[in-house]
Amino acid sequence: MRFDTKIAVVLRDDLAAWQKANVTAFLVSGIAGTVPGLVGEPYRDASGNEYLPMFVQPVLVYQADAPALRRAYGRALGRDVSMAIYTADLFETGHDEANRAAVAGVASDELDLVGIAFRAERRIVDKVVDGLRFHA
């Protein structure tokens, strides 16, 4: 199945494995919570157990060094793409209110980005992530 949109996550390539998993989970939660119809129906196994629904389309995960991540962030902003961000400061906080305060206290050009995630039309996503490699 081909979708008109793509979901992309861009992670800074110098993160520890646990940080990559944590950042990805937090970033995609922002997308899931704001796009109606993006989450499908619950899953059920043959034994009758029910599981939570997931995205109806794939999530593409890219890696980038800090300058390339900043470039992708700028491209997304320049195209008015709504995105979730995760900054290094958020590793030191423990809840949503503190996370939002940490972001609010820093100008956009000074955010220490470690990851971004967004959903947009295919061609726009392709332009934002141009030159990036899939996460290995």
Q: Can you name each region flagged by the protein language model?
A:
Residues 1-136:
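Positively charged, small/polar-rich N-terminal and surface patches that mediate targeting and assembly
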